[in-house]
A protein has these predicted regions:
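A generic "binding-loop/recognition-motif" signal
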Residues: 27, 102, 130, 302-305, ...
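Accessory C-terminal segments flanking Radical SAM cores
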Residues: 235-372
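Conserved alpha-helical substructure of the radical SAM core
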Residues: 1-121
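Residues embedded in well-ordered beta-strands within globular domains across many folds
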Residues: 70, 123, 191, 230-233, ...
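Short loop/turn motifs at secondary-structure junctions
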Residues: 30, 64-65, 118, 186-189, ...
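Conserved residues at the C-terminal ends of beta-strands
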Residues: 21, 37, 72, 125, ...
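Radical SAM enzyme [4Fe-4S]-AdoMet core and its adjacent flexible, acidic
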Residues: 115-117, 125-127, 132-281, 292
């Protein structure tokens, strides 16, 4: 079996690329697919301001190059000391990204504070190309018509803007139209989430394995239009990108053909080289998640508790926990264990766990049949 790998300049066994900190569970929205099952008010046990500063010190404890600290939620803007925490992190030289919700909290003053505090990137969610679809997912009538101006305001402020889209049965047909919105607004990154059944996402319609494959081929095509394309919980996108670069033809499925035709109609022929993101990170390898109460998990969608930053330094948890050693060992079962793309991809460990209770099982959303099967 020929193994397909991608060299990395960072040893992900020692240092993550991304540290996600869920600074609060509070959020004014009630999105159908919310990982956090967010609530209007903060939950008891949130890390205090002093504990938050201590966590920032722990992130710095990984050493340089520091991981990117992604402040998420809930809605990170509902945490009263959020910009004090941002200032503390940037003063240490830690790159900071923020993931606010589009609510009345996202004001021009808040955007100005992001710029002044040195925030490197901001991500917003866009889950449909129409008000009916997006608002249906977000649970707030009129939210789409608030989101588009918010995207433009962030771009106009000079911030790097990432748009997060969660793919599900109700919006998969609008992906080409969403790509058009991103191109028109000058967005830098499109991060496409594929459902894992945690939180409120348990009640949301996931697409099939074959549809996952066709969407990934579409996303490869979309990466030629001026914005970076990344995926969350679909590491097999990296396998698709590698195969396409090796000359594999696109599939002839109806979903792919429809999305591809929409892309050509809306944006014309591809005009740039692919900017698909293929860093071989996955849950617990290059990624670690700190919940609102300081509990540590391999990722936000993989609810395997690893310890608490209140009692153990984050770097020690990340480097030494046996669960993370297992995930990084690539001793996968099923198709993932036989796959020549295991290092580049590795499958969604979160989806494997959600489906089987075993984080080393095969990813049930992957349609690929490895050569060893």
């Amino acid at each position: 079996m020929t193994t397909v790998t991608r060299p990395s300049k960072v040893d992900f066994s020692q240092r993550p690329m991304l540290v996600f900190w869920e600074v609060t569970r509070a959020c004014l929205l009630a999105c159908r697919h919310c990982r956090a099952s967010a609530t209007p008010d903060a939950l008891p046990g949130e890390l205090t301001h002093e504990e938050g500063l201590a966590l920032i010190d722990q992130v710095a404890g990984f050493g340089r190059p520091y991981p990117i600290l992604v402040l998420t939620g809930g809605d990170c803007l509902l945490r009263p000391d959020i910009f004090e925490l941002v200032d503390a992190a940037t003063a240490r030289g830690i790159p900071v990204a923020m993931s606010p919700s589009v609510t009345p909290m996202l004001t021009s003053d808040a955007i100005g504070r992001m710029v002044d505090s040195g925030v490197k990137a901001v991500s917003l969610s866009l889950d449909g190309a129409t008000a009916a679809t997006h608002d249906g997912v977000r649970g707030i009538p009129g939210h789409f018509n608030q989101t588009i101006p918010a995207i433009r305001a962030l771009v106009d402020a000079g911030l790097k803007v990432q748009i997060n889209t969660t793919v599900m049965q109700s919006n998969v047909h609008e992906l080409a139209d969403i790509a058009k919105i991103l191109a028109d607004t000058g967005v830098d990154i499109w991060e496409v989430f594929f459902l894992v059944h945690v939180g409120r996402g348990e009640a949301t319609g996931a697409i099939t394995a074959e549809e996952h494959e066709q969407v990934c081929h579409f996303l490869h095509d979309a990466s030629h239009y001026g914005f970076i394309v990344r995926t969350v919980e679909a590491p097999f996108f990296r396998r698709v990108v590698a195969q396409r670069r090796q000359g594999l033809p696109a599939p002839d499925g109806q979903l792919y053909e429809r999305l591809r035709a929409g892309l050509l109609t809306l944006l014309g022929e591809p005009r740039e080289r692919s900017s698909a993101h293929t860093a071989s990170t996955r849950d617990g390898k290059g990624i670690v998640f700190v919940a609102h109460d300081g509990e540590v998990f391999p990722a936000g969608f993989l609810p395997l508790p690893l310890g608490s930053v209140r009692t153990t330094p984050l770097a020690d948890i990340y480097r030494d926990h046996p669960v993370l050693h297992e995930i990084r060992s690539m001793n996968f079962t099923g198709k993932c264990g036989l796959c020549e793309f295991a290092d580049l991809c590795g499958g969604s460990r979160a989806r494997a766990y959600a489906a089987t209770g075993d984080p080393l099982a095969e990813d049930t959303a992957c349609a690929y049949e490895p050569a060893g099967v």
